[in-house]
């Protein structure tokens, strides 16, 4: 018992010989032992004040511009977001931090130094625990924390079927890599779709079949019925020379030949020069392209941006 009292007295005298600054209270405090936490807000985000510290002597503006203060504000903001709940077990791996979570839940039932409007306290961050050292552990840089949080967003789970630790907490309905993020991702999807559907139409007609199409003369009876070219929509005149397809549709030669050089089909009835219906062939080609696109999506877990 006497040894414990002596140890406590030695620890108290060691703390009294040093000055500590709480980044949440933004003031000088005398930390609680042996956890080294702030007596006002129960936060472990405290730091020993040394001769080169600017926490107390530099005024409020220098404190607000310090990296540690910016990190505290960032952490305070992320603490109240929905997805940070999943990150806490991975950002706080120290057993002492896990033990203090139960104590913090108990402290949240009453108001503290900041009054009833103060939001819930933050999880314990890296603390000053070493009695022999003269400098506390420095908090990690803001960039490192952000990289640690967002590094796993687009990574696949190491175990198939198991949720990734850096998940979106159910906000997304599938892997984030399956989504189109930004204009670049959308352009990649459209480009792949166009590439799959590029050659799904009927193939070009044979040149021999195109040249063998008969050239006929428009009669007065056809003109009286209002016969026109289905491509350019111009009315035919009597004795005008036009090309006749096997489906008995008439076209200007300058209108139908360029089309047949690209597609072996009638622009009106979609029948080929052989008299076969090309609609079924087109549907079969589109279904095949859709299956290829689906297979490609399954092979690639996420888009490459």
Swiss-Prot record:
Modified residues (Phosphoserine): 133
Listed pathway(s): Protein modification; protein ubiquitination
Catalytic activity field: S-ubiquitinyl-[E2 ubiquitin-conjugating enzyme]-L-cysteine + [acceptor protein]-L-lysine = [E2 ubiquitin-conjugating enzyme]-L-cysteine + N(6)-ubiquitinyl-[acceptor protein]-L-lysine
Chain residue ranges for the region called Disordered: 100-139, 274-305
Phenotype for residue 229 to S: Loss of E3 ubiquitin protein ligase activity
Post-translational modification: Phosphorylated by AKT1, allowing association with the 14-3-3 chaperones that facilitates associating with TLRs.
Cystine bridges: none
Bias type Basic and acidic residues, positions: 100-110
Listed InterPro entries: RING_finger_E3_ligase (IPR051834), Znf_RING (IPR001841), Znf_RING/FYVE/PHD (IPR013083)
EC id: 2.3.2.27
Ranges of compositional bias, category Polar residues: 280-297
Keywords noted in UniProt: Acetylation, Cytoplasm, Cytoplasmic vesicle, Endoplasmic reticulum, Golgi apparatus, Metal-binding, Nucleus, Phosphoprotein, Transferase, Ubl conjugation, Ubl conjugation pathway, Zinc, Zinc-finger
N-acetylalanine carried by residues: 2
Annotated zinc fingers (RING-type), start-end: 229-270
GO cellular component, as recorded: cytosol; endoplasmic reticulum; Golgi apparatus; nucleus; phagocytic vesicle
A biological-process GO annotation: protein K63-linked ubiquitination
Pfam families assigned: zf-RING_2
Superkingdom of this protein's organism: Eukaryota
Deleted gene: phenotype: Deletion mutant mice exhibit resistance to RNA virus infection such as ECMV and susceptibility to DNA virus infection such as herpes simplex virus HHV-1. They also display a significantly reduced infection/inflammation-dependent tissue damage after pathogenic bacteria S.aureus infection.
Major localisation: cytoplasm
Outcome of swapping residue 22 to A: Loss of interaction with EGFR and FLT3. No effect on E3 ubiquitin protein ligase activity
Record carries keyword RNA-binding: no
Compartments where located: Cytoplasm; Cytoplasmic vesicle, Phagosome; Nucleus; Endoplasmic reticulum
Function: E3 ubiquitin-protein ligase that catalyzes the 'Lys-48'- and/or 'Lys-63'-linked polyubiquitination of various substrates and thereby plays a role in a number of signaling pathways including autophagy, innate immunity, cell proliferation and cell death. Plays a role in the endosomal trafficking and degradation of membrane receptors including EGFR, FLT3, MET and CXCR4 through their polyubiquitination. Participates together with BST2 in antiviral immunity by facilitating the internalization of HIV-1 virions into intracellular vesicles leading to their lysosomal degradation.
Oligomer status and interactors: Interacts with RAB7A. Interacts with EGFR and FLT3. Interacts with BST2. Interacts with STX17. Interacts with YWHAE.
Protein's recorded name: E3 ubiquitin-protein ligase RNF115
Origin organism lineage: Eukaryota, Metazoa, Chordata, Craniata, Vertebrata
Primary gene name: Rnf115
């Amino acid at each position: 018992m006497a040894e414990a009292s002596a140890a406590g007295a030695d620890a108290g005298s060691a703390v009294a010989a040093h000055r500590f600054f709480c980044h949440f209270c933004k003031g000088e405090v005398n930390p609680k032992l042996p956890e080294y936490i702030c007596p006002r807000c129960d936060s472990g985000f405290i730091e020993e004040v040394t001769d080169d510290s600017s926490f107390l002597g530099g005024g409020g503006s220098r404190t607000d511009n310090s990296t540690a203060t910016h990190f505290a504000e960032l952490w305070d903001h992320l603490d109240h977001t929905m997805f940070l709940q999943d990150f806490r077990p991975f950002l706080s791996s120290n057993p002492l931090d896990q033990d203090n979570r139960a104590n913090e839940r108990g402290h949240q039932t009453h108001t503290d130094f900041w009054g009833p409007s103060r939001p819930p306290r933050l999880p314990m961050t890296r603390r000053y625990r070493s009695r022999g050292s003269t400098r506390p552990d420095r908090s990690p840089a803001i960039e490192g924390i952000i990289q640690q949080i967002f590094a796993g967003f687009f990574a696949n789970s190491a175990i198939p079927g198991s949720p990734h630790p850096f998940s979106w907490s159910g906000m997304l309905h599938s892997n984030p890599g399956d989504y189109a993020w930004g204009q670049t991702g959308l352009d990649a999807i459209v480009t792949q779709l166009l590439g799959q559907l590029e050659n799904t139409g009927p193939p070009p007609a044979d040149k021999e079949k195109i040249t063998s199409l008969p050239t006929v003369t428009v009669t007065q009876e056809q003109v009286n019925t209002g016969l026109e070219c289905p491509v350019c929509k111009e009315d035919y005149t009597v004795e005008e020379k036009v090309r006749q397809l096997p489906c008995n549709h008439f076209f200007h030669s300058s209108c139908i030949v360029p089309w047949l050089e690209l597609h072996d089909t009638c622009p009106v009835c979609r029948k080929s020069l052989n008299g076969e219906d090309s609609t079924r062939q087109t549907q079969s080609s589109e279904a095949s392209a859709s299956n290829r696109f689906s297979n490609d999506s399954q092979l690639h877990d996420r888009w490459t941006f």
